[in-house]
Amino acid sequence: MLNLTNVDDALHKGEEWLETNKKTFLSETETGISFKDNFADLLLLELSNRWDYPVIVPEDYPEDNDTNAVAFSILKPTDSRAKVLIDEILACKNADGIVQVHLDPNRPRIAPEVSANILSLFYSYGRGHEVQESLSYLQKAMALEEYQESRYYFLPEPLFFYTWRLLCIASGSALETIDNQRLPKELHTLRDHLIRRVSARLGTAKDNALCPALRILICHSLGIKNDVDLQLLLDLQEDDGSFGRAWFEGLDPSSARLHERGLHAARKTENNPRPPSDMQQRIHDPQMQYARWSDWPLAPSIARNDKGIQHDHHTLGSLESPRPSHDLLLLHH
C-alpha cells in the first residue's frame, strides 16, 4: 500500500526543485553543446501554468506544424491571428488529406503524434471537422496493439499524452479533465483506444520517469486506478527533488534522443498561479506576428529540419551523415 506521506514529500521536493531551477532547463549534448527547446518549454508552460519556469525562446518558430499547433493551442492568440495559421496548416495536407509535419510541401512526412497536436489546435478553435482525415490516421495508430516507432518518437507515452491532451481540449475541459458528456462523438473511439493502450502499459518503462508520470496523469482523468506507476515515481525521485533523465523524443534526422528534466518534473507536481496580465496582453497585441515572439526573452534555440540540427547557426548533424553506432544523447537539464 502506498504511503501518502511519501507522496506528499515527493510533491514538495519536486516543486522545490522546479522553483530552484526555473529558467535554467537547458538541453545538452554529450559533446557539451547546450540549447533551449521551445517545444518542451511550451508544454512546461501549459502543465505548470508558470510563466517564470520556461523561457519561451525562439525569435521565429521552427517551420513545422507541430510546434505552431501546440503554441497556438496553449497561448490562445486572437481568433483572427489563429485563422491565418490554421489556414496555412490546412494547405499542408497530403494526397490522403492528412496534415503533414512541415509547412514545407517538399517534406511529405506524417506522424500520429503530430496529428494529435494539430487536431488539438483545430478542435480548440471549433474547426475539428476540417481535419477528419488526420483523426482517422491517429485512430488507426492508436488501434494497434504494439507501438510503431516513428522518425520522431520511440516510446508510446508521448502519443498517449498528445491524444489525452486532444480529448481534454475537444471536450472543452481544463487540462487533466475529460468531460465525456461534451466529448465529440467522433472522438469516443479514440478515447476507448487510449484507455486500452494505457492500461496495457502500466508498470512498464521502469527506468524512464516520464512514462509512469504521463500514465498517472491520463489514468487520473479516466478513472483508472494506477498505484503501480505512482510507486515507480516515488522510487525514481532523486535527492534534489528531480526525477533524473527521462527520454521524451528523437531529433530528426539524427535519431538523437531528447530529455527535459523540467518538463517531466512539472508533469509530476502541481503549482498553478495564473500568468500575469501583462503577458496575456502581449499575446493579444495586434503588433505581434503569429510566428514571431521578439519581445520575449530569447535564448539559443534549435531548429529541427532535414538539413540538420541547427544551434546558433552551427550544424550539429546532417541528413547525409551516417547514423552513429550509438544514439547521440541529448540531455535536458
Swiss-Prot record:
Biased composition (Basic and acidic residues): 323-333
Pathway: Secondary metabolite biosynthesis; terpenoid biosynthesis
Reactions mediated catalytically: (2E,6E)-farnesyl diphosphate = (S,S)-drim-8-en-11-yl diphosphate
Keywords: Lyase
Region (Disordered): 312-333
Family classification: Belongs to the HAD-like hydrolase superfamily.
Function: Terpene cyclase that cyclizes farnesyl diphosphate (FPP) to drim-8-ene diphosphate used by vviA as the native prenyl donor to catalyze the prenylation of D-mannitol on C-3'-OH to afford sporulositol A.
Protein's name according to its UniProt entry: Terpene cyclase vviB
EC identifiers of the protein: 4.2.3.-
